[in-house]
Amino acid sequence: MSTSDFYLRYYVGHKGKFGHEFLEFEFRPDGKLRYANNSNYKNDVMIRKEAYVHKSVMEELKRIIDDSEITKEDDALWPPPDRVGRQELEIVIGDEHISFTTSKIGSLIDVNQSKDPEGLRVFYYLVQDLKCLVFSLIGLHFKIKPI
């Protein structure tokens, strides 16, 4: 699979008393990682970072996604975005293009109480893995604490 067959974007955020607070990252086909973290808490400023990652990182990302089997899931029964917030995950991998939208998930309790706990659990753990990878890449590359 060539890198031109791959794209990933994740967003989680809400609009509250501190304005629009969100975390967003994307991996583009050319290996560019774009990261944005906006928190207005105590007048924090938005953190925006961009870096190129090696082909091996992109291959590992694809492996994580393939292993998760997220492409077999459907968000039809997942909780819709609400005042607490929203999450979006978009993936292009090979000839598949999938997009998921759901509310923010606080914990596995929220997952287990949903109408599709098995599918939402796949999403929940994949997002945890992706965030961990991105925070590590950003932290190592820029020597900052992403959150």
Swiss-Prot record:
Keywords: Cytoplasm, mRNA processing, mRNA splicing, mRNA transport, Nonsense-mediated mRNA decay, Nucleus, RNA-binding, Translation regulation, Transport
UniProt keyword RNA-binding present: yes
Transmembrane segments: none
This protein's GO CC annotations: catalytic step 2 spliceosome; cytoplasm; exon-exon junction complex; nuclear speck
Cited Pfam families: Mago_nashi
Cellular compartments annotated: Nucleus; Nucleus speckle; Cytoplasm
GO biological process: mRNA processing; mRNA transport; nuclear-transcribed mRNA catabolic process, nonsense-mediated decay; regulation of alternative mRNA splicing, via spliceosome; regulation of gene expression; regulation of translation; RNA splicing
Main location as per UniProt: nucleus
Record keyword Transcription regulation present: no
UniProt GO MF annotations: RNA binding
Subunit structure: Part of the EJC core complex that contains casc3, eif4a3, magoh and rbm8a.
PANTHER family: MAGO HOMOLOG, EXON JUNCTION COMPLEX SUBUNIT-RELATED, PROTEIN MAGO NASHI HOMOLOG
Function: Core component of the splicing-dependent multiprotein exon junction complex (EJC) deposited at splice junctions on mRNAs. The EJC is a dynamic structure consisting of core proteins and several peripheral nuclear and cytoplasmic associated factors that join the complex only transiently either during EJC assembly or during subsequent mRNA metabolism.
Family: Belongs to the mago nashi family.
Protein name: Protein mago nashi homolog
UniProt organism field: Danio rerio
